[in-house]
């Protein structure tokens, strides 16, 4: 049970959020509960969708974005996001079970991606206070400065959704995955 309203239909959401939810519905074919919950603040929904959309056009590929989302959700204990990104990782990014397990454990089966995921984990654990060596390792793995910035942005974006879902008890509307099961 959520702690705040979860509009059951697009028309039940605040008027300013309705066109944003229509866009989500058009893109995904449905409106997952995360978006319904965030629609309580049209400004927050617009900000989330804007950053998410911009980063989707960035330098990091979909696989790396999903790997980061899984690692961050695991650290933050967000079952909603673990469930969503396990589903998206398998079905859209084509990550296999071994890769998803590695991501949830803070790494990757791919050597280059392992460095990016490890950096994302360091960002969360150190609250952004990473070392010169942390940054240098990502550069040496072949990531550009644009990709470095995007890793930080993805950590922030995923932390936002983790906190929204955990703070307000968003009902999981994906096949359920538990943080305790990593």
Stretches with model-predicted labels:
Residues 1-182:
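Hydrophobic alpha-helical segments
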